[in-house]
Amino acid sequence: EEVLVRSGVSLVDMAGARNNLKQELADPFGWDFEKVVNNARSVWNEYLGRIDIETDDYLQKKKFYTNLYRALAAKATWSDVDGRFVDEDERIRQLEKPGDCIVSGEYWNTFWNNQQLFNLITPEISSQWARSAIQLYQNSGWFNTDPAGIEHTGVMVAMHPISQILGAWQSGIRDFDMHVAYDGLKKMMLTPPQKYEGGGTVGVENLVPYMEYGYIPAGKGTVS
C-alpha cells in the first residue's frame, strides 16, 4: 500500500505552516510525488551546473559536486512565504517584500571560503543573506555575531558579518543599503559586551581589554 504524506513547516504559527504547504507544495505539485522529485532535481541541477569541471576521473567529479551540494545546502529560510517571521524578541514581524526572505547562515569563519563561493556562483542568495542581516539589525538595533534561530547567541568573539557583507559588496552585490549596514556594524564594534533584553549577548566580547592594552592579554578574555 502506498501512503503519501505532505507536511508544512513554519516558525511563526500553524496558519503559516498551512500557507507554506499550500503555496510551496500543494498548489504547484498536488499529490504528484514524481513532480516534486523532478522539481528538486531540476533546481539542484541548475545550481550545481553553474560550475563545470573537466576531468576523466569520475570519483573526483563525484567528490566535487557532492561537496558543492553540501556547501550550498547550508542556507535555510526562516521566514514564511507571506514574509512573516519571529524576531529576536519573539515578536511576529512582516517583511515589506516577502521575496526578501530571512535567511539563516553559518557565520563562524565561513567568510574565508563558503561565503565567497556564494558570492561567485549564487549572488542572489548572498544578496538575500545581506538584506536579511540588515533587516534583523533594524529590528533589534544590533547585528548578530553568530545567530541560532534568529537569536543573539553571543558565542562568537569576532564580528564575521563585517567580512561577509563587505565581501558581497566587493563582489558587486550591492542591492542592499551599505550605509545602514556600516552604521550598525560600527556600533557593534565599538560597544562592550552587554546582555540583550530579548536574550543573549551583543557587542564585542573582548573589546574592553583590547582598548586598554591594544591586545587581549591571557586571562583577560576567552582568547589571547
Residues covered by each model-derived region:
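Acidic/polar, glycine-enriched structural segments that form the non-catalytic walls/loops
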Residues: 1-102, 143, 174-193
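Aromatic-rich carbohydrate-recognition surfaces in CAZymes
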Residues: 103-224
